[in-house]
Amino acid sequence: MAKKTAIGIDLGTTYSCVGVFQHGKVEIIANDQGNRTTPSYVAFTDTERLIGDAAKNQVALNPQNTVFDAKRLIGRKFGDPVVQSDMKHWPFQVVNDGDKPKVQVNYKGENRSFYPEEISSMVLTKMKEIAEAYLGHPVTNAVITVPAYFNDSQRQATKDAGVIAGLNVLRIINEPTAAAIAYGLDRTGKGERNVLIFDLGGGTFDVSILTIDDGIFEVKATAGDTHLGGEDFDNRLVSHFVEEFKRKHKKDISQNKRAVRRLRTACERAKRTLSSSTQASLEIDSLFEGIDFYTSITRARFEELCSDLFRGTLEPVEKALRDAKLDKAQIHDLVLVGGSTRIPKVQKLLQDFFNGRDLNKSINPDEAVAYGAAVQAAILMGDKSENVQDLLLLDVAPLSLGLETAGGVMTALIKRNSTIPTKQTQTFTTYSDNQPGVLIQVYEGERAMTRDNNLLGRFELSGIPPAPRGVPQIEVTFDIDANGILNVTATDKSTGKANKITITNDKGRLSKEEIERMVQEAERYKAEDEVQRERVAAKNALESYAFNMKSAVEDEGLKGKISEADKKKVLDKCQEVISWLDSNTLAEKEEFVHKREELERVCNPIISGLYQGAGAPGAGGFGAQAPKGGSGSGPTIEEVD
């Protein structure tokens, strides 16, 4: 039976991270490469699907079919200006499917297209597997984090991605709230504290102000830029070096996707180096038309290239302070989250803005969000550990929610930054005499007129008895649950007739059937990946067996113990298999197993003949030994089942 462990997943734009709360503390779990964060990358090749480090490592060779930044697409429409501007930067293709963006790739020789939810679900599956490998049992319950800025549609789509990955999503929580939980556990001082969380990650930037009082977290304000992060700093470096290459070599590499990709990888590495050193060097062999590109960059130059971006991080800080109605002197703690907060200049700007206040860096910035999500998961699973017992979590609505009233005016029922879950009711009436029905149009946004806000959904309440304008009483209730999902109900008080809508977003929400189909496809892909792994294992087993046999009979210590005829027989057969392998790398598992058996039939009698009564193998012992016979000492090779 699956143990009741729940995990916390930080599903990032560029990197993801998973943690679990057990034995009274949080463990951030390393992946099979030993990394505690995993790239949010999925790659499709002629033979397989790769997720995480394996996908990111081959991106230069396969840029068109390596998908990243799915978080920038999730829950958005194709026509969204953000999607349109991002598409210019991506090497993979995004296509329009009924105003939903889909990523188009070539997988196993055919064109396939995937919704952003499917790509994100593949990353979530990877995170789930990382946790399962560490815990040693299946895991289904998870808390997943999203930027505080995400609207309802983006939250829903993230939840769908979790479902497709086979997870039971206990809750979607804001990243800064998660970081605050991590922080709240680390320090339980008494009295109310105002905390500003500065989260500059690979793709998004969030500033949040929370008050923590006796284990209760309340989000006071959120601000940020959904499009600022480490990748933007990488882009500045890339442009800088593209220009330098032009100056030095009179060639423009910007149209060559592979060269740009290799340059970008080197830039990311240089950027990380510059957080701890004042200079970094780039060495890229044969970058373009056989030209090696060796160069270096100083920290000062990097800061100059990104100065406007770095300075720009302070605007959302000021906005959040205004929204929270706090002065900067009233902030008790500054918390850094996200890998990009390791950049010394970013730290200095923030520190100077707060008049030299110390920054809190005690939490590893890459891991803080997953850490908090893991704690929240433990709370929701009813963990009785005293570390989490007294923690209460209040989240907020990122945008005001309301409906359209006469003249296209936005009437907000739930104000931005209201603590959720929450329920608000207001009474409306008709605009004209004998009006038979009302159209309830639900919007999110801060502008006075609905045309400038975002329509979430609409429904009609009909059958209102004829009456003069202003007489009927229509009671409208907005109810947001802890996941930020909205139910709107309208009731005619005279008849008791009601109608409602659950805003799980007409715009871009996947249907039950689509999710079901994607869950099944995800299972199928997983099975295909498994088949591929077995195939490769069988191929490798055959290859090593052939080479082992070859080196065994060529061993100098065997001179005179094996007849030339036998030796030739083994060598010829091994050579035949090795040649066959070279031209049949894509054969099925069964073919490899069959070839292996064929080779064993030739080799085993000869090799075991050598061992009859010969004791242990001679110098340089064989990498293989007949399954039967032999003295039982020396290495054996197992049949691959």
Curated annotation (Swiss-Prot):
InterPro entries: ATPase_NBD, Heat_shock_70_CS, HSP70_C_sf, HSP70_peptide-bd_sf, Hsp_70_fam. GO terms for biological process: ATP metabolic process; binding of sperm to zona pellucida; cellular heat acclimation; cellular response to heat; cellular response to unfolded protein; chaperone cofactor-dependent protein refolding; chaperone-mediated protein complex assembly; defense response. It holds the Pfam family HSP70. This is Heat shock 70 kDa protein 1A. The N-terminal nucleotide binding domain (NBD) (also known as the ATPase domain) is responsible for binding and hydrolyzing ATP. The C-terminal substrate-binding domain (SBD) (also known as peptide-binding domain) binds to the client/substrate proteins. The two domains are allosterically coupled so that, when ATP is bound to the NBD, the SBD binds relatively weakly to clients. When ADP is bound in the NBD, a conformational change enhances the affinity of the SBD for client proteins. Molecular chaperone implicated in a wide variety of cellular processes, including protection of the proteome from stress, folding and transport of newly synthesized polypeptides, activation of proteolysis of misfolded proteins and the formation and dissociation of protein complexes. Plays a pivotal role in the protein quality control system, ensuring the correct folding of proteins, the re-folding of misfolded proteins and controlling the targeting of proteins for subsequent degradation. This is achieved through cycles of ATP binding, ATP hydrolysis and ADP release, mediated by co-chaperones. The modification Phosphoserine is found at S631, S633. It is found in: Cytoplasm; Nucleus; Cytoplasm, Cytoskeleton, Microtubule organizing center, Centrosome; Secreted. The modification N6,N6,N6-trimethyllysine is found at K561. Keywords: Acetylation, ATP-binding, Chaperone, Cytoplasm, Cytoskeleton, Methylation, Nucleotide-binding, Nucleus, Phosphoprotein, Secreted, Stress response. In response to cellular stress, acetylated at Lys-77 by NA110 and then gradually deacetylated by HDAC4 at later stages. Acetylation enhances its chaperone activity and also determines whether it will function as a chaperone for protein refolding or degradation by controlling its binding to co-chaperones HOPX and STUB1. The acetylated form and the non-acetylated form bind to HOPX and STUB1 respectively. Acetylation also protects cells against various types of cellular stress. The modification Phosphothreonine is found at T636. It comes from Rattus norvegicus (Rat). Belongs to the heat shock protein 70 family. Induction: Induced by oxygen and glucose deprivation in neuronal cells. The modification N6,N6-dimethyllysine is found at K561. The modification N6-acetyllysine is found at K77, K108, K246, K348. Residues 2-386 are annotated as: Nucleotide-binding domain (NBD). The modification N-acetylalanine is found at A2. The gene is Hspa1a. GO terms for molecular function: ATP binding; ATP hydrolysis activity; ATP-dependent protein disaggregase activity; ATP-dependent protein folding chaperone; C3HC4-type RING finger domain binding; death receptor agonist activity; denatured protein binding; disordered domain specific binding.
